Amino acid sequence: MSHNSQAFLSTNAGLPPSYETIKEEYGVTELGEPSNSAVVRTTVINMPREVSVPDHVVWSLFNTLFFNACCLGFVAYAYSVKSRDRKMVGDVVGAQAYASTAKCLNISSLIFSILMVIICIIIFSTTSVVVFQSFAQRTPHSGF
């Protein structure tokens, strides 16, 4: 029999060969501590992660196109673009300052616009009720 067939034809049918048999067969030796152990040194470098500054350009553009109360949306858009420019240059503090101003202007524009929409709805609904009542009183009802 060849060396390859001995692994398949063992006396322990159905049982895996023992560790000693494999160790002797393949010449595995147990390794201990390395004879000349070198000191392992580690170096930790703290890399500052890139600070993400939201510039609110999309929100400002939305307010400019749809809720431009007192031109606050347009001014917020200008500050958002300035914030993005400062971020591209690398001035994080300036970008945060412009972004904060743009955020405040966007909030103000949104609040003013929502209030204007609510006031317009109230005026339209009360006016339509008054007009409907005045037409109902003036027109006589026919018996048909």
Swiss-Prot record:
Membrane topology: Single-pass type II membrane protein
Lipidation (S-palmitoyl cysteine): 70-71, 104
Primary residence: membrane
GO biological process: cellular response to interferon-beta; defense response to virus; host-mediated suppression of symbiont invasion; response to virus
InterPro entries: CD225/Dispanin_fam, IFITM_antiviral_protein
Modified-residue entries (N-acetylmethionine), positions: 1
Listed name of the protein: Interferon-induced transmembrane protein 2
Record organism: Mus musculus (Mouse)
